[in-house]
């Protein structure tokens, strides 16, 4: 979503592969705010990048204990996602490329579109532009007009055409090219 909205997108390291926060034990806390014990601290979101599934996750050598614990790099790492066309990394790179190619995604006006409960749809660009984004958080269908899925979170649907009603799965998002009326 952040790559389809106006402004400068910000990805914190690990976002591009879907890294999740790593539990940090009290003894491993390094964040000064967390050391005070008044708040959990920021360490769970600052753990080492998971570059590969090997020892140290490609961040450090085997046997070296990093500043903060490493997450499950076997389940989620850059090396594996580079080879997977359906990965979060590939989706992120493709959305960045689409944003680079499409001025409306970088600086076009935002307008909210009518959306059923559990969905959010918006348009970027001039009023006559037909590029729309939809994000579904529920189970309803969206009426958007005939068009094509340019890029979606379900990569098997990229290029899929629809005749007016678009169904998105739970938590599915898509950048759409809608045919002119």
List each model region and its residues:
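Beta-strand-rich binding/interaction modules
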Residues: 137-156
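A conserved amphipathic helix/loop scaffold
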Residues: 131-132, 158-160
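C-terminal beta-strand-rich structural cap/linker in extracellular carbohydrate-active enzymes
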Residues: 160-181
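Loop/helix patches that line or flank the sugar-binding groove of alpha-linked glycan CAZymes
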Residues: 1-128, 134-139
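Low-complexity, intrinsically disordered short peptide segments enriched in small/polar/basic residues
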Residues: 17, 26, 146-148, 159, ...
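A short acidic, often aromatic-flanked loop/helix-cap motif at beta-alpha or helix-coil junctions
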Residues: 56-57, 155-158, 173
């Amino acid at each position: 979503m952040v790559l389809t909205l106006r402004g400068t997108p910000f990805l914190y390291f690990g976002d591009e592969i879907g890294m999740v926060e790593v539990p940090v034990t009290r003894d491993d806390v390094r964040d000064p705010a967390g050391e005070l014990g008044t708040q959990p601290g920021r360490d769970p979101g600052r753990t080492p990048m998971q570059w590969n599934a090997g020892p140290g996750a490609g961040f450090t050598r085997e046997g070296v204990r990093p500043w903060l614990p490493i997450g499950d790099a076997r389940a989620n790492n850059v090396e594996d996602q580079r080879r997977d066309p359906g990965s979060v990394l590939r989706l992120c790179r493709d959305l960045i490329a689409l944003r680079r190619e499409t001025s409306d995604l970088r600086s076009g006006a935002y307008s909210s579109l009518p959306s059923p409960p559990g969905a959010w749809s918006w348009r970027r660009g001039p009023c006559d532009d037909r590029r729309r984004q939809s994000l579904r958080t529920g189970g309803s269908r969206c009426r958007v007009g005939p068009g094509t899925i340019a890029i979606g979170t379900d990569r098997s649907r990229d290029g899929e055409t629809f005749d007016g009603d678009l169904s998105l799965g739970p938590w599915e998002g898509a950048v759409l090219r809608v045919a002119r009326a």
